[in-house]
Amino acid sequence: MLQQRTIKTLTRAVGVGLHSGQRVELTLRPAQPDTGIVFRRVDLPEPVDIPITATAVVDTRMASTIGAGGAKVHTVEHLMSACAGLGLDNLYIDITAEEVPILDGSSASFVFLLQSAGVELQNAPKRFIRVKRPVEVREGTGQQLKWARLEPYHGFKLRFDIDFAHPAVDSTGQSAEFDLGEGNYARDIARARTFGFTKDVEMLRSSGLALGGGLDNAIVMDDYKVLNADSLRYDAEFARHKILDAMGDLYLVGKPLLAAYSAFRSGHAMNNLLLRELLAHEDAWEIVTFENERQAPAGFTQPVRAW
């Protein structure tokens, strides 16, 4: 039987929110089988639980925000991406503010924390959402066109194409692909950082966003080049970060997907719209388990290796 996973022991992190600039503490705790991943706002007078689901997403402006009972947690996608990459099914995430810490702008620190806590197999079958037919969402036309698509696939793979007219992006690549069964999430995707442009920073900060952003937790570019002293971590780091984000956004459906995801100029809003479109058509998906691990798709049977 392909089993569910949680962590063996609790682990903690402290940082600041990318957009809020607030100091925040995270405590990641093991959870029982079939719990799912649950954020808990422990800073409120009465703690509020926010289980991840596609419909728990309440805002997608610059990040994925989930909410329940009047409480919200912003910028969950990097932590969710790490959970997806490591195949974690059950986890409590206690948080002391309204935004997940940005740490270094990637998922690498979350992967390190979770792997340090250890991955534990649980005596319950791992449940997948298997996509049975293509589902697509589109927006705009011509230069404004963007789209995202899920198609049947015995495994989980992603392709993302971006479209940024910038020398640094052009020189490293406008597209990236990742197959969970062939690649290594920790090595190939997790270290890709969020990115932005100096020309946008003032506008974002005037809107109360990017207050915690800087060269230590994002790739920052002027009109011509990357400003970070350490330059880039990957070829096509920009497109790889979009894959990282997409993995986190899609994991908000609450179960791992068996599907091929492809997208052009998509973002948090379109990724969530794609999940809602999938769930709205019951003939397009089904819940499956694997009693025989040999029949399970590659990438889900073994815990992700370290770097």
From Swiss-Prot:
Its EC number is 3.5.1.108. GO terms for molecular function: metal ion binding; UDP-3-O-acyl-N-acetylglucosamine deacetylase activity. One of its GO terms (cellular component) is membrane. Keywords: Hydrolase, Lipid A biosynthesis, Lipid biosynthesis, Lipid metabolism, Metal-binding, Zinc. Zn(2+) binds at residues 78, 241, 245. Its cofactor is Zn(2+). This is UDP-3-O-acyl-N-acetylglucosamine deacetylase. It comes from Acidovorax sp. (strain JS42). The lineage of its organism: Bacteria, Pseudomonadati, Pseudomonadota, Betaproteobacteria, Burkholderiales.
